[in-house]
Amino acid sequence: MRDRTHELRQGDNISDDEDEVRVALVVHSGAARLGSPDDEFFQKVQTIRQTMAKLESKVRELEKQQVTILATPLPEESMKQGLQNLREEIKQLGREVRAQLKAIEPQKEEADENYNSVNTRMKKTQHGVLSQQFVELINKCNSMQSEYREKNVERIRRQLKITNAGMVSDEELEQMLDSGQSEVFVSNILKDTQVTRQALNEISARHSEIQQLERSIRELHEIFTFLATEVEMQGEMINRIEKNILSSADYVERGQEHVKIALENQKKARKKKVMIAICVSVTVLILAVIIGITITVG
């Protein structure tokens, strides 16, 4: 997709910041509906948000389960299978979000023909914001799993040292991990060392877990790669829009306070007018009485 951010920055005679604020304000829930096509668009956006909320929940659950397994020397097969099932759910939700984002992405022809349209710019902004959130979430998941992998490798390294297999260097360990087969990995360890059965089982289990992790990380990376470049290019624009939205919200809040103060001042002014009118009326009445008495006495 061709990046036309520079054209948006040029704009026309209207301030870019004001335009972007008006466009971006429809990103949030409660935005005004502009017609049936937009109702359908916002329904799709709501579906994406719901799917991403599920994805975020699964990522949090994955983090908790990884901590539990790391704390268990020999995790049961059911625990490892549960973790793998969770990874599969995350990948499936990631694919769903990717397809949903693709469905709301403005087509190039539409974007070119109606680029100055508020609706088109709103859709591009909405798509960019959601894409950025998705990429950040997947990046978080990948970083979390990479950290989990390193902790598993460290567990293997400690086991090798405990069992007097400390002669295995970090480079050799990585080469054995890259073998892709637990049997080869284990046989390489057994060549020159005496390893207890329990330690061997844990090392083998950790190696299998690392293999699954690496596959999961690769697959997740493939899911969001197509969005990463576009999000990076539009990141500056999105950040500027967010800043303008916050500034506008602050401006609206201050404006509401000013209106409230003005209304209170208006009420006070009305009361003062009434009091002045009463005072004037009483004064006139007193003068009339005095004049009347003077005339009568005279």
Swiss-Prot record:
Membrane topology, record value: Single-pass type IV membrane protein
GO cellular component: basolateral plasma membrane; cell surface; cytoplasm; dendritic spine; endosome; extracellular space; glutamatergic synapse; lamellipodium
Modified residues (Phosphoserine): 15, 29, 36, 117, 208, 248
Residues on Cytoplasmic side: 1-274
Tissues expressing this chain: Expressed in the outer and inner hair cells of the cochlea.
Disulfide feature: none
Transmembrane is among the record's keywords: yes
Residue ranges the record marks as coiled coil: 38-163
Main subcellular location: membrane
Residue ranges of every copy of the t-SNARE coiled-coil homology domain listed in the record: 200-262
Keywords: Cell membrane, Cell projection, Coiled coil, Hearing, Membrane, Neurotransmitter transport, Phosphoprotein, Transmembrane, Transmembrane helix, Transport
Site description Required for neurite tip localization, residues in chain: 290
GO biological process, one term: long-term synaptic potentiation
Pfam family, one: SNARE
Lineage top rank: taxon: Eukaryota
Region annotation Interaction with CENPF: where it falls in the sequence: 154-298
Subcellular location: Cell membrane; Cell projection, Neuron projection; Cell projection, Stereocilium
SMART domains named among the record's database cross-references: SynN, t_SNARE
Protein name: Syntaxin-4
Species, as recorded: Mus musculus
